[in-house]
């Protein structure tokens, strides 16, 4: 029988209730089938967390970043990627600190998390009360809902470049049904092989975009006029804000780890790798096609149809299925807790209970099929609060009392100036994101989004489709 031993692991002041990995310790005679299952299916290491963070962060935005560069210009595009990558890593660190603080306090009260997945709104509830819980729940769930919608839209947008016999709306119906199968993936523990494959797929696509654009050379009469208007400039900036705001699932990824206290620098390391994919590909595509990207939000649409491009499309489709699972799984958990089946051991019962969550995702993807502009709108209105403003404010309020700072499980690193430096950085994040991300970005993104509705209409069958060739 597999070991069910619970160890108390001391990491600073942090008492973590760590459960040994099933069928690895204490069962040396486990079958080959079980070992393979553990290897591919049961992930909880630092490496699993890194793959999950990197894979989740660089999904379909890889295809829309050249579009953002055409709005921003080359220099601003590069600088915003570096700036928001660093800022996103900082707020992911804050979320990890708050998670560890919350979990430590609960475990000192003998709370057992073996059949319960901790989520961000519960961290806010435990540290700051029900009003913060409600705020976190509303913003996080809405962001993850539209994050799932964006992946579904991206699936339809990409497959159209291989098979245009069906319009994008029909492809959305088909991929909505395919993505609904993610209800059978229990938790982030079970994304081990998917995270690895997803990152490998986006790595291929990134370098395909880079190399194919360089080999293609600059298009005839190419122009690089960005930025031309304030609306386009801040729309592009908020798409990059969205790109590096993929840590809305940080708490769930941490909870899937065997030793969550080791998460601290993982998101930063994942971001560094992601930048090696996004900077070359976005720069190369923008260099090759320039202003043409303003009317082609999907970078694949401008590259010639080849076997390499078709491979990139197929790999991105698979990866978007994986990222759909990343975005929707926390929603599944919230729904399970709401209807009282979260701690049910029957995975089939939980899967059936999750299915209603897919319906609104499917419906919204059909209403707003605006691949590219929807990223900026979600970035400015939801990501700005969910993963930047709320974590920074929550961290400041949690440790505002002197006793909380003295007894903190994770103290700020000296390199940022201790508590004083941390508060200064947090205040800067809140002010910058509120003014630039939510304020200017929200205005620009909504103006652009409304233009798409006026031009194409809601429920449009085939957004930005070229004339059909018989």
UniProtKB/Swiss-Prot annotation:
Family per similarity comment: Belongs to the amino acid/polyamine transporter 2 family. Amino acid/auxin permease (AAAP) (TC 2.A.18.1) subfamily.
Regions crossing the membrane: 58-75, 78-98, 135-155, 171-191, 193-213, 231-251, 265-285, 313-333, 355-375, 377-397, 427-447
A cellular component annotation (GO) from this entry: plasma membrane
One Pfam family, short name: Aa_trans
Record keywords: Amino-acid transport, Auxin signaling pathway, Cell membrane, Membrane, Symport, Transmembrane, Transmembrane helix, Transport
Gene Ontology molecular function terms on file: auxin influx transmembrane transporter activity; symporter activity
Main location: membrane
Topology in the lipid bilayer: Multi-pass membrane protein
Organism: Arabidopsis thaliana
Superkingdom of source: Eukaryota
Known function: Carrier protein involved in proton-driven auxin influx. Mediates the formation of auxin gradient from developing leaves (site of auxin biosynthesis) to tips by contributing to the loading of auxin in vascular tissues and facilitating acropetal (base to tip) auxin transport within inner tissues of the root apex, and basipetal (tip to base) auxin transport within outer tissues of the root apex.
UniProt-recorded name of the protein: Auxin transporter-like protein 3
Coiled coil: none
Extracellular side: 76-77, 156-170, 214-230, 286-312, 376, 448-470
